[in-house]
Swiss-Prot record:
One of its GO terms (molecular function) is acetylcholine receptor inhibitor activity. The modification 4-hydroxyproline is found at P7, P13, P21, P22, P27. It holds the Pfam family Toxin_14. Expressed by the venom duct. Its main location: secreted. Belongs to the conotoxin A superfamily. It comes from Conus ermineus. The lineage of its organism: Eukaryota, Metazoa, Spiralia, Lophotrochozoa, Mollusca. Alpha-conotoxins act on postsynaptic membranes, they bind to the nicotinic acetylcholine receptors (nAChR) and thus inhibit them. This toxin binds with high affinity to both fetal (alpha-1-beta-1-epsilon-delta (CHRNA1-CHRNB1-CHRND-CHRNE) subunits) and adult (alpha-1/beta-1/gamma/delta subunits) mammalian muscle nicotinic acetylcholine receptors (nAChR). The modification Glycine amide is found at G30. The keyword Disulfide bond applies. The cysteine framework is IV (CC-C-C-C-C). InterPro entries: Toxin_14. This is Alpha-conotoxin EIVA.
């Protein structure tokens, strides 16, 4: 999923959720 104020530029292999970066709420590899 993409997180941060700029989802298009800040993508993470995790589900987005309010919290500390990378705002992972469900590990999805990498």
């Amino acid at each position: 999923g993409c997180c941060g104020p700029y989802p298009n530029a800040a993508c993470h292999p995790c589900g987005c959720k309010v919290g500390r970066p990378p705002y992972c709420d469900r590990p999805s590899g990498g």
